[in-house]
Curated annotation (Swiss-Prot):
This is Unknown protein from 2D-PAGE of fibroblasts. On the 2D-gel the determined pI of this unknown protein is: 5.0, its MW is: 46 kDa. It comes from Mus musculus. It comes from the Eukaryota.
């Protein structure tokens, strides 16, 4: 799965 969004 894609990593969590950062920001």
């Amino acid at each position: 799965p894609k990593p969590p969004d950062r920001g």
